[in-house]
Amino acid sequence: VVEILSALSIRMVHLSRLAEELILWSSQEFGFATLSDAVTTGSSIMPQKRNPDGAELVRGKAGRVFGRLTGLLSTLKALPLAYNKDLQEDKEALFDTVETVLLSQKVLTANILGAEFHSRRMREAIEARQGYANATELADDLAARRGMPFREAHAAVKALVELARSQGRKLEDLRLEEFQEVAPAADHGVYEALRTDAALARRSAVMGTAPSRVREALEDARARWQPRKT
């Protein structure tokens, strides 16, 4: 039983993290997703507010499942290696955990199926470059393509970010001459390295962010969950 609770606790870690992503993505600050009316509620004070109740409840249920596992482990730690009546405590923990996990999966499924994802807003958030998220791509490009030691490439890109930030510019808005003042090995290829689509495509390792790898992961997930013919 304790092994089942352990496995289900790990599953709830993943479900809770997914729920947290949905909560963040549906917030006004992110604006990456809109959850359906079926899994949200309004506010008694603020008429415009949509509370992601379903996802929040799943996140909370994770703590409940972890508590069941911790409780049973605490019971087991003091038992001799034989059957004891204390072990009756595992039934309530097991049944409650299984029911909680199954319900959490249904709720998250409803959240995802009913959600509207705003890809344009996601791209806008990336391309705003407020955090210079493409700086690492530039460092990797200087090291891999132009042969700079990564330590030097890292320092050069840090200086370029400071330059761009001080002027309220994006890295890709810098002139080639400005790149070369800090990193003489830089050429016009740095602009390709800084493009969002190019950066995603380069991450082509298994489970990477390249579109081809994302499609593979989706196809694999669908295949795993297809009803098995007997």
Per-range role (PLM):
Residues 48-230:
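Glycine-rich cofactor/substrate-binding loops
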Residues 1-75:
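Internal glycine-rich alpha/beta core junctions
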